Regions:
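Positively charged, small/polar-rich N-terminal and surface patches that mediate targeting and assembly
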Residues: 1-109
């Protein structure tokens, strides 16, 4: 069975976790679509607070902003392009907040 996979070129995948103000959602999906990152999972409403600056996103009376998050798996050679576009989006509206983190994918099915 190992011989079957010997000749297949395995793609190196990375996970990109993107946390952002809900106002960025359409733009985040558009970035992924334009860069041919077809598969992703969005978490519609999440709560959190940035580690450096920015207001908490708790969806409460005191902190009404709401955050969203998206997780996507992309080929290693697309990571830099995705991060560059996300950085541009974040810099265009810095008060909203957007963070992205990249992890190695060790295995998948």
């Amino acid at each position: 069975m190992l011989q079957i996979f010997k000749h297949k070129k395995l793609k190196v995948l990375k996970a990109i976790f993107i946390s952002y103000d809900q106002a960025h959602h359409e733009a985040v999906v558009d970035i992924l679509t334009r860069l041919s990152c077809r598969g992703f999972t969005s978490f519609g409403e999440v709560q959190g607070r940035g580690s450096k600056t920015g207001d908490p996103h708790y969806g409460s009376h005191a902190w009404p902003s709401i955050a969203s998050a998206t997780l996507t798996m992309v080929e290693d050679d697309r990571v830099d392009s995705v991060l560059a576009r996300l950085r541009e989006l974040d810099e265009s509206k810095p008060l909203l907040g957007l963070r992205a983190f990249v992890w190695n994918i060790e295995a998948s099915i």
